[in-house]
């Protein structure tokens, strides 16, 4: 059998042609799109009418459509970008994101697989490709992509970080720790890597885990996930007062962060500080009325106070929100006994 290698540019042309064929009639509508109600999108549409050959305008509008989860419209605009500039790297990256969020993972991967052929030395593109390969559980392909990056830039910290992510996803804890440690050695400002390292150390019952959380906070004092990870470590090691103080700190950093309210409420219930717990749960229910756990623990708080009817109503609401919530079902049964 004779194998014919098709140049990347030809593949890209065929893909762009396919995209444009699929949305040609819609694409014409996109150029002459009527008012959408979004002033920024409408302003870009007017600019496109005046400058229909400017790929940057289509790209900006595609980003806005993507932000609004209008995926089909985003794809159509990105097809226009690629027709005007078939090697537009940012358009490739955005198109892959759109496809992935639009539940078209195969198209997302194909889009990113084309980009390295056009930009073989783009580390950013290869990193994004490895991320998508990880999402799709294509571990061997991800390893190969990361190896390609190491050939271009040996010891690249972001590639080492992604290597750790792949190892972690496969349950290879020791290799993951080694990869993340190598990443932070080369770039100590990688807050997320410090958090993950702390979590992995905690899983192995290594008391040094808290040092990694502290490093993450030192690098990025506003990283709520780092503060939360430290608080969770403390509460799991019976350092309740310290954990509660950190949850207060998280409230200051992000008043809309639900986990801090839930965890602090549970700890307060554990401490028999029922009224304080109920205040936390009330805020949580206001932030996220569909949070079944908030209603369940509200029910427990009412139960501890002897308020049976209020407890029953809260447990029932938890079950309405999540009919698989066995703890709420068991709690209701206990109330009836």
Question: Can you annotate each of these PLM segments?
Answer:
Residues 20-79, 83-85, 101, 110, ...:
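N-terminal leader/linker segments that initiate helical-solenoid repeat arrays
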Residues 26-30, 35, 270, 293-296, ...:
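Terminal, low-structured helical/coil segments at or just beyond the last alpha-helical repeat
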Residues 34-43, 69-80, 102-114, 136-148, ...:
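Structural signature of tandem alpha-helical TPR/SEL1-like repeats
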Residues 50, 84, 118-119, 152, ...:
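Structural marker of alpha-solenoid helical repeat scaffolds
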Residues 55-56, 89-90, 123-124, 157-158, ...:
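Helix-start (N-cap) detector for alpha-helical repeat units in TPR-like alpha-solenoids
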Residues 66, 93, 100, 127, ...:
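Position-specific recognition of the canonical hydrophobic site in helix A of tetratricopeptide repeat
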């Amino acid at each position: 059998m004779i194998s014919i290698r098709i140049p990347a540019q030809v593949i890209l042309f065929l893909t762009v042609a396919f995209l444009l064929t699929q949305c040609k009639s819609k694409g014409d509508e996109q150029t002459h799109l009527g008012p959408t109600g979004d002033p920024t999108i409408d302003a870009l549409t007017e600019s496109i009418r005046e400058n229909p050959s400017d790929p940057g305008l289509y790209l900006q509008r595609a980003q806005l459509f993507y932000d609004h989860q209008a995926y089909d419209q985003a794809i159509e605009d990105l097809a226009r970008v690629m027709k005007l500039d078939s090697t537009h790297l940012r358009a490739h990256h955005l198109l892959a994101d759109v496809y992935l969020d639009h539940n078209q993972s195969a198209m997302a991967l194909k889009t990113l697989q084309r980009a390295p052929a056009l930009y073989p030395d783009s580390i950013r593109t290869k990193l994004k490709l490895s991320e998508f390969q990880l999402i799709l559980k294509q571990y061997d392909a991800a390893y190969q992509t990361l190896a390609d990056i190491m050939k271009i830039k040996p010891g690249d910290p972001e590639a080492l970080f992604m290597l750790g992510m792949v190892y972690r996803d496969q349950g290879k804890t020791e290799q993951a720790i080694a990869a993340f440690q190598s990443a932070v050695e080369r770039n100590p400002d990688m807050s997320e890597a410090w958090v993950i390292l702390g979590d992995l150390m905690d899983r192995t019952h290594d008391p040094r885990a808290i040092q990694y959380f502290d490093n993450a906070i030192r690098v990025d004092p506003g990283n709520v996930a780092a503060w939360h990870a430290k608080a969770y470590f403390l509460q799991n090691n019976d350092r309740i007062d310290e954990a509660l103080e950190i949850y207060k700190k998280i409230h200051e950093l992000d008043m809309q962060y639900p986990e801090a309210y839930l965890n602090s409420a549970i700890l307060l219930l554990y401490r028999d500080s029922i009224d304080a717990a109920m205040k936390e749960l009330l805020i949580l229910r206001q932030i996220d009325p569909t949070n079944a756990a908030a209603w369940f623990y509200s029910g427990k708080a009412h139960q501890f106070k002897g308020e049976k009817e209020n407890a029953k109503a809260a447990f029932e609401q938890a079950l309405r929100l999540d009919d698989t919530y066995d703890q709420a079902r068991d709690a209701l049964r206990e109330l009836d006994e």
